[in-house]
Every structure is written in C-alpha cells, then in structure tokens.
UniProtKB/Swiss-Prot annotation:
InterPro entries membership: DNA/RNA_pol_sf, DNApol_viral_C, DNApol_viral_N, HBV_DPOL, Rev_trsase/Diguanyl_cyclase, RT_dom, Viral_Replic_Matur_Polypro
UniProt domain comment: Terminal protein domain (TP) is hepadnavirus-specific. Spacer domain is highly variable and separates the TP and RT domains. Polymerase/reverse-transcriptase domain (RT) and ribonuclease H domain (RH) are similar to retrovirus reverse transcriptase/RNase H. The polymerase/reverse transcriptase (RT) and ribonuclease H (RH) domains are structured in five subdomains: finger, palm, thumb, connection and RNase H. Within the palm subdomain, the 'primer grip' region is thought to be involved in the positioning of the primer terminus for accommodating the incoming nucleotide. The RH domain stabilizes the association of RT with primer-template.
Organism: Chimpanzee hepatitis B virus (isolate United Kingdom/LSH/1988)
Segments forming domain Reverse transcriptase: 346-589
The protein, known as: Protein P
Miscellaneous: Hepadnaviral virions contain probably just one P protein molecule per particle.
Description of how activity is regulated: Activated by host HSP70 and HSP40 in vitro to be able to bind the epsilon loop of the pgRNA. Because deletion of the RNase H region renders the protein partly chaperone-independent, the chaperones may be needed indirectly to relieve occlusion of the RNA-binding site by this domain. Inhibited by several reverse-transcriptase inhibitors: Lamivudine, Adefovir and Entecavir.
Segments of this protein annotated with the region Spacer: 178-335
EC number: 2.7.7.7, 2.7.7.49, 3.1.26.4
Binding positions (Mg(2+)): 418, 540-541
Length: 832
C-alpha cells in the first residue's frame, strides 16, 4: 500500500507524537528505508513511456516558444541626459574625505568600462532587427529603429559614420576627445584614410571656410577604385560625400569633413550608392546654421554600375509612375521635404576598424509585466556567452539570504531609490564599439528579405532590380499608419544604420558585474558620509534606512543631492517609502526577520493548484518549478532537502512524476512560511561531536554520550549529534568541528534525514571548534570521566562577502559635519 501523507509526516518526525529523537533520527539515515520511501513516492522510477507534460500553469520549458505579444501603440521610454561625471572619485573625496582602496578600485572599473572579447562573430545587417513579430514586421522595424534613434540622441549609442569614425550626442569624455579629429590633427592622422597625403590638403583647399562651416566650392568625388586606393576627380557635379552609414555631417566645423571624405564609397556593403538628382536640400546643422547639400547626379555614379544607381530607395518613389493604388509613391509624394537621409552627432571620434555588420540582434518587448504601455529594447549579444567565442564573465558576491537578514533586519525606517536607466550610466571605452554593434539594413532590404515575391538588391552591381517589387498592400497600410506617428522620420528610419554602444548594454554578462561594483562603492561612500544611515544596494536597487522617519527624509534629500551631483539620475516619482518593513530583492525584511514578498507566495499557491499528479513532467518545466520553490525553500520546515528528488531528475534530464503524497508534502511545506531570523552574537555554551559509532554532547557543565546501532558515515554521525544537542538543550548556538554541518547545507545527506535535520536545526547558528579543543570530543569516544574546561567561543554573525563596512580613513578635520538637524541619535549608528 502506498505511503500516505500522514504516515510520511510521522516518518519525517514533523508530528509531535514521535518517539525519543535519539532512537528515531538515526533510522532516517538508513539506506534501505530511503530507497523504499523513494519507490513508494515514485521518486526514482526508470524512464516512462507516457508522453511528457511540457506545460504546467504558466511554466513551460526553458527554451519555450511562447511568443511575446506585440503592441502597436508602444511608447518609447524617454532617457534623461545621463552623464556620469568623469572625476567621480575626486567628487566623492571632496564630499567624504579620502576613499578606501576598495572603493577607488570599484569606481575605476567603470570609468570607462572595457570589453575585449577574444573573438567576435559579425552578422549581416539583415539580422540587426529580429523578425520576432511576423504579423507586425514593418511596425516592429520602425518602433525598434525609433528606439535606437532615441538611445543615440540620449548619448547611449555611437553611430558608425565610416569604418574608422563614429559620431555621438551628449557630453564627451576625455578618452573620447583624445580621438577627435581637430582641424590640424586630421591631416597627420589621415594616413589611414588616404593613400597619398596631398589629397587631404587638396580637399581642404577646395573648400572655403565660411561661418556656415565647410561648404563645397567646386565639388570633388573621391571614388573607391579597388579596396582602399583613392583618386580625386575634379570635373564632377557639385557633390557631397554620401555613402552608406556616412552622410554629410550636420555640425558646422572643419572636422566634419574628415567624416565625409573618409566615408567615401569604399566599404563593401556600400558600393551600391551614389545620389540621385534632386533639388538642393537645406538643412540645419547642430550648431544652428543651415548647411547646403548638393546631390551627386546619377551620371557620376559608381565605377562598375550598369545604368543609373540610386542610394536613397525612399526618395526614388517621388518621380516615378505609381504601379497601383498601394504604390509607395503615393506616400512619398505626400511631403516635399522628407528631411535628411541621415543625421550626425555633435561629436566625431576615431574608433578601431568597425565593419558594416552587427554582432547582435535587437527586438522590443513590454517594459515589464506591470507596464505594457512602454517598450524595452532586448539586445541579444548571446554570442559572448556561448560556444567557442564565450567570454568568462567576472564572478561577484551576491548577498545571501542570511547575510541580508543579518544586515537589514532591524527597527529602521526604509525607503528605496529608483535609479533611472542604471546600466546606461556607465560609459564604455570606444575600443569596445566594434564588438557591440546593433543596427538595421534599411527598410528596403528588410522588407525584401521577408516578402517572398520581391528580389533583394543585386549585390554584384548594386542595381535595384525593380522598385515596385516592394510595393504591397500590407506595407502601404502599415506605412500610412506609421506616417501618423513618425511623420518625415519614416525617411530617416528607412535608411540602413549601424550603431555601437557608448554605455554598457544590458545583454552582456559584464554589465551586471560592473553595475554591482559601481553601486556598492557609491553606497559605501554614502555610509561614511552619513554615519547614522544604512545605505545598501544590489544592482540598481538602492535602499536607505534611518532610525526615524524625519531623519530618513532629511537623509533622502541629502543623499539625492549627492547622487545628482555625481551625475546619477534618480526617478523621484518611483521612490518608495516602506516604513519598518523593507521590500528588497523579492523579500520583505522587518525587525522580525525575512519572508518572501506576497506576489511570490501567490505564485507558489497557483503553481501547486496546477501541478498534475501521476503525469511525467518535462525536466525543463521542473527547472522552472524548482526555481520558484527554491526561492522560498529557506522559509519552509524542510528547506532545500525537500526539493532534492526534483533536483536529481533535472540533473539526470529525466521526466519527474509527482505522486499524490509528495505533492501533498510539498504543498503543506509551502502553505506555512516561517521567517528567517537575524543571527545574534553570543557565547557558545553547547558543543557536539561524534565518531562513526557514538555521539557526545557538552551543555554547560552537563555531559552526555550515546552510541549508534550500526556504524554511520562520519558526516551523518556529526549531523545527528548536532540535532541531539539542539533538541536536548534548545540552544541556538552550537559548537561543532564538522565543516559540512557548519555549512548548514543538508542536501547531500540521506534524503529523509536531510529533511528532518533541516527542521530540527532551523534557526541554529554554528561555531567552528577545532577537534583538539572540542569539549565534546571525549564524551563522543565514550570517556565521560575526563573533564576539559569549556573554551570561550564568541559567535559573530556575518554579513557575507557584501563588503559593507569599509574601514574609514581619518577624515580631514576641516570638513563640516554633514547632517545638521535635531537628531534623536547622538551616537553614530553601528550595524546590528
């Protein structure tokens, strides 16, 4: 008869009417019993022929194909003008006195951040925007392109102008200015651009300098003959240097000319381009002047083309006969002025050689489950986490649950700060640009690739087979709708573009590491500037605690001003005041301890409601289930050991079948959650020790010993001794000389014993006693007569490796006291 849930509870000693612990507990270590229970509960059956279940409630396998939902009305979030101050270390030192070595090292890591992978795979531009939403291809293309444009305008992306130059908006950093083409320096650096020096000077002389910036007087067209050899022909129509990804610069300074001339048509992806004959367009430079642009007439186009070649796919629809009522020429003729073909940033810099390719695809999703009105850009740089091009990301300490509780469980008032676009605060060195490229191939190529009837551009000669191939009702309808949203920007966005990251992107394993180092260093500085405040952060989640609400408010003002002075942008609308129970990292932390947040508890209840019984569940779905249950495991009676059967089946990549008893057991475990309490420091009075055959305890001056029925593995024996010590003495502090017991991880013990021991030892702290000094050593060997004095062992709770309290160097005396207010606190508050 299968094991019922009541019997199972009794077996695990979870009920009160169990017999004496010294007899019952060793029985749970018996291998035979564990095997019989496992068979009864269906925990280790061989592979089953019933088909696996691949979905449980909302959980599907890790590589599930649940497509995200496209929202045609997504708003692109706005990004503040984020510019982290370059001399952040000096600013902190003015504020708080000398920084510690640790803080300096962490801050220097991200000023600027560097990223040098061993090898980088380049993908064609068509893969720049992922076709994630097959029914909304065009809409998704423009929304994504608009998002990238917004990031570029906010100074978060570089725009690739030529193979070796890029432009960006916002304030430059010193490592970027060093690369800038000045009027003079350009000629010395131009060796990489022109093969013969005189070309540079001849170009310069042919251009008059006016207050409008650089204007072509008699045009020149530098044309790629083969590879990078250059020739200059002067009997050509008035021109500007236009080619793919490089179009005349809009800032009225000499150095822009570098980007124009350097651009010329020598990139392979670009060879298809020169410009059609239309009117001269006026357009405004970033410095506010109008710059005249003249276009190349089609007769002067590229060297090997057969017939006229146009680069601007969009504007060609202006002068041709419509092919049908859905021809794009109807849309293009709506406006006379579609604006420039490309825009240029305020600053131009030299960059390492960057091909006209991308290294990762992008697509849009909802900003978060609670905010579906705004979009979020997902960047897939997974090539750096997979296969031969894998980069070993740096490891960093994440505070574990006990450390977090020791640190934050107190009677303080709390608030949490919201750092807006935290990742985009940290600057990347321009040398990383060639590895982190995103972009798009332009609308014509994108549409051609996705529609079966149209042919992609003829690469060999760069001719467009037939403009009307791309006209279709779907495209026309989508573009007419988008015209209402984007207006003349449709033209700008229909051009190809390549962008590199100027701030750290979210899709690279380096970013979380850098952000964690950065915010922890800043919090360390804040804690020393305001000694009676507790500031703590994990990634972009920053919390402040103080003894009273008034105190907290004045701290909030002071800390916010300090962070703003460093160039860190906070979102004041999202500041949350928690009172005495802090919500942080998915937990609720109060003076009583820590519990999981309510939404997680609800998720667990729903999970159990939908768990099928006696049906094999795909191990990938089990991973999802274990992920959720594992988060709340420390708050249950049996903890992680209860989930061991699930872990085992995931490791074996086998399906798992929940028996009614095992499901009832887990469901009961998670129905009552117990808080994890803060550890207290204290003097250890109770010691436990064991040998394979016997155990011994010392409680103050009382000593006990006992023997096991059969010899046991030493770790198991030590664990049993610790359980006896806890149940006999009730002490929350026990001395032991076994490292496995000290670690409080009971997952490697026989399953039933692990579950029972977890419940008995819940909330117990252990202190390490070397065997030679352990008073319980003699009793465990059966020698009660010998008496050795108790050693004074002090237990200090740890805050793990969260490196909280930087040793503060002496602050120079002339610095004023930071916080002036009637504080109820006359002494600096120390951590609990």
């Amino acid at each position: 008869m299968p094991l019922s849930y009541q019997h199972f509870r009794k077996l695990l000693l979870l009920d009160d009417e169990a017999g004496p612990l010294e007899e019952e507990l060793p029985r749970l270590a018996d291998e035979g019993l564990n095997r019989r229970v496992a068979e009864d509960l269906n925990l280790q059956l061989p592979n089953v022929s019933i088909p696996w279940t691949h979905k449980v409630g909302n959980f599907t396998g890790l590589y599930s194909s649940t497509l995200p939902v496209f929202n045609p009305n997504w708003q692109t979030p706005s990004f503040p003008d984020i510019h982290l101050h370059q001399d952040i270390i000096n600013k902190c030192e003015q504020f708080v006195g000398p920084l510690t070595v640790n803080e300096k090292r962490r801050l220097k890591l991200s000023m600027p951040a560097r990223f040098y992978p061993n090898s980088t795979k380049y993908l064609p531009l068509e893969k720049g925007i992922k076709p994630y939403y097959p029914d909304n291809v065009v809409n998704h293309y423009f929304q994504t392109r608009h998002y990238l444009h917004t990031l570029w305008q906010a100074g978060i992306l570089y725009k690739r102008e030529t193979t070796r130059s890029a432009s960006f908006c916002g304030s430059p950093y010193s490592w970027e200015q060093e690369l800038q083409h000045g009027a003079e320096s350009f000629h010395q650096q131009s060796a990489g651009i022109f093969s013969r020096a005189p070309v540079g000077s001849s170009i310069q002389s042919k251009h008059q300098q006016s207050r409008l910036g650089l204007q072509p007087q008699k045009g020149l067209l530098a044309r790629g003959n083969e590879g990078r050899s250059w020739s200059v022909r002067s009997r050509v129509h008035p021109t500007t240097w236009r080619s793919f990804g490089v179009e005349p610069s809009s800032s009225g300074h000499t150095n822009n000319f570098a980007s124009k001339s350097a651009s010329c048509l020598h990139q392979s992806a670009v060879r298809k381009a020169a410009y059609p004959t239309f009117s001269t367009t006026k357009r405004h430079s970033s410095s506010g002047h109008a710059v005249e642009l003249h276009n190349i007439s089609s007769s002067s186009a590229g060297s090997q083309s057969k017939g006229p070649v146009f680069s601007c796919w969009w504007l060609q629809f202006r002068n041709i006969e419509p092919c049908s009522e859905y021809c794009l020429s109807h849309l293009v003729s709506l406006l006379d002025d579609w604006g420039p073909c490309t825009e240029h940033g305020e600053h131009h810099i030299r960059i390492p050689r960057t091909p006209a390719r991308v290294t990762g695809g992008v697509f849009l999703v909802d900003k978060n489950p609670h905010n579906t009105a705004e979009s979020r850009l997902v960047v897939d740089f997974s090539q750096f986490s997979r296969g031969s091009t894998r980069v070993p990301w740096p490891k960093f300490a994440v505070p574990n649950l006990q450390s977090l509780t020791n640190l934050l469980s107190s009677n303080l008032s709390w608030l949490s700060l919201d750092v807006s676009a935290a990742f985009y605060h940290l600057p990347l060195h321009p040398a990383a640009m060639p590895h982190l490229l995103v972009g798009s191939s332009g609308l014509s190529r994108y549409v051609a690739r996705l529609s079966s009837n149209s042919r992609i551009l003829d690469h060999q000669h760069g001719t467009m087979q037939n403009l009307h191939d791309s006209c279709s009702r779907n495209l026309f309808d989508s573009l007419m709708l988008l015209y209402k949203t984007f207006g003349r920007k449709l033209h700008l966005y229909s051009h190809p573009i390549i962008m590199g990251f100027r701030k750290i992107p979210m899709g690279v394993g380096l970013s979380p590491f850098l952000l964690a180092q950065f915010t922890s260093a800043i919090c360390s500085v804040v804690r020393r500037a305001f000694p009676h405040c507790l500031a703590f952060s994990y990634m972009d989640d920053v919390v402040l605690g103080a003894k009273s609400v008034q105190h907290l408010e004045s701290l909030y003002t002071a800390v916010t001003n300090f962070l703003l002075s460093l160039g860190i942008h906070l979102n004041p609308n999202k500041t949350k005041r928690w009172g005495y129970s802090l919500h942080f990292m998915g937990y609720v932390i109060g003076s009583w301890g820590t519990l999981p947040q309510e939404h997680i508890v609800q998720k667990i209840k729903n999970c159990f409601r939908k768990l099928p019984v006696n049906r094999p569940i795909d191990w990938k779905v089990c991973q999802r289930i274990v992920g959720l249950l594992g988060f709340a495991a420390p708050f249950t009676q049996c903890g992680y050991p209860a989930l061991m059967p699930l872990y085992a089946c995931i490791q074996a990549k086998q399906a798992f079948t929940f028996s009614p008893t095992y499901k009832a057991f887990l469901s009961q475990q998670y129905s009552t959650l117990y808080p994890v309490a803060r550890q207290r420091s204290g003097l250890c009075q109770v010691f436990a020790d064991a040998t394979p055959t016997g155990w011994g305890l010392v409680m103050g001056h009382q000593r006990m010993r006992g023997t096991f029925v059969a010899p046991l593995p030493i770790h198991t024996a030590e664990l049993l001794a610790a359980c006896f010590a806890r149940s006999r003495s009730g002490a929350k502090l026990i001395g032991t000389d076994n490292s496995v017991v000290l670690s409080r991880k009971y997952t490697s013990f026989p399953w039933l014993l692990g579950c029972a021991a977890n419940w008995i030892l819940r909330g117990t702290s252990f202190v390490y006693v070397p065997s030679a000094l352990n008073p319980a050593d003699d009793p465990s060997r059966g020698r009660l007569g010998l008496y050795r004095p108790l050693i004074r062992l002090l237990f200090q709770p740890t805050t793990g490796r969260t490196s909280l309290y930087a040793v503060s160097p002496s602050v120079p005396s002339h610095l004023p006291v930071r916080v002036h207010f009637a504080s109820p606190l006359h002494v600096a508050w120390r951590p609990p």
